[in-house]
Amino acid sequence: MKKYLHTIILLSVFSFSQAQIKFNQNLKMELDSILKSDQIFREYIDSETDENRKLEILKETGYSKEEFAKNTWGIIKKQDSINLIKVERIIAEYGYPGKTLVGEPTNEAAWFVIQHSGKIAKYFPLIEKAGTNKEIDFTKVAMMQDRLLTSQGKEQIYGTQGAGKRIINKETGKEDFFRYILPIKNPELVNELRKKAGFTSTVEENAKRMEIEYKVYTLDEINNLK
């Protein structure tokens, strides 16, 4: 009898596990909506977005051009907070909603929300596991790891994170906005590490994409910039 009950329990656990990884259309639709709301305002402020598309975004989101310009990051952060509440609820119920559960590119929705939150340290182990299990592209793991490290004042690994600060131009004496790739640990190996992680571009090419002239800096050099 005990053996019989044990078998039933094992089958029940297996069935529950299988149910957890079954494709979930309703969850996919919810995450697609979350992903859209995460990206739409960032699309608006992207320098490559044309004026017609910007007008479409304003109409779709219900903001006037003046209203959005006055409180751009306040609006974005408010939406980020709403999205984070939703994603944390989803993670609590399903774990990371990866490729098996919601397909691609929906499997990136939770990643974007966490990447834009203040809770990267809490959820990075979950993201790393999802990447290892091929539920999300490992380049996303690398990008989040870089953001986590740089937020802690440490060197990044893959050179995915750029930044900028206002400094005094020594030649002109005027204030300039200086953009740079945040310091990298072992910069001589960065392109090899990027390739292993799945990136198709070099650190130099990635910097150019961000309109940054790539140069190697140490943490001390960046901290002493004025």
Locate the predicted segments by residue.
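Short aromatic loop motif centered on NTY/YTY
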Residues: 134-185, 196-197
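N-terminal helix-rich structural modules
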Residues: 21-159
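A cross-kingdom marker for long, charged
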Residues: 189-226
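Short acidic alpha-helix initiation/capping motifs at coil-to-helix transition points
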Residues: 118-120, 182-187
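A generic structural signal for short
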Residues: 5, 76, 178-179
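A generic alpha-helix surface/boundary motif
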Residues: 85, 187-188
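Long, hydrophilic "mature protein body" segments
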Residues: 70, 74, 180, 221-223
